[in-house]
Curated annotation (Swiss-Prot):
GO molecular function, one term: oxidoreductase activity, acting on NAD(P)H, quinone or similar compound as acceptor
GO cellular component: plasma membrane-derived thylakoid membrane
SUBUNIT field: NDH-1 can be composed of about 15 different subunits; different subcomplexes with different compositions have been identified which probably have different functions.
Source organism of this protein record: Acaryochloris marina (strain MBIC 11017)
Taxonomic classification: Bacteria, Bacillati, Cyanobacteriota, Cyanophyceae, Acaryochloridales
Compartments where located: Cellular thylakoid membrane
The keyword Transmembrane is annotated on this UniProt entry: no
Protein name as catalogued: NAD(P)H-quinone oxidoreductase subunit O
Enzyme Commission number(s): 7.1.1.-
Length: 69
């Protein structure tokens, strides 16, 4: 299933590890990043803006690092 605006998604850890996005982030990511779901707020090119179900800022991740929840 393609990722689109409003979709609930999960991060695929195997695709996220060693990516540019992972290297630019703190190595101690909180559990909700991999255990919970997030909602796609916007898509621009190869990136999707994700809002997790906790009160934290949104993040931009590559669409190929996400899977439908």
């Amino acid at each position: 299933m393609a990722v689109k605006k409003g979709s609930l998604v999960r991060i695929v850890p195997e695709k996220f590890e060693n990516s540019v996005e992972a290297k630019a982030s703190d190595r101690r990511l909180p559990p909700y990043v991999f255990e919970g779901t997030g909602e796609v707020l916007e898509i621009k090119g190869d990136y999707a803006q994700i809002q997790f179900r906790v009160p934290v800022p949104t993040v931009w991740l590559r669409v190929d690092q996400l899977e439908a929840a």
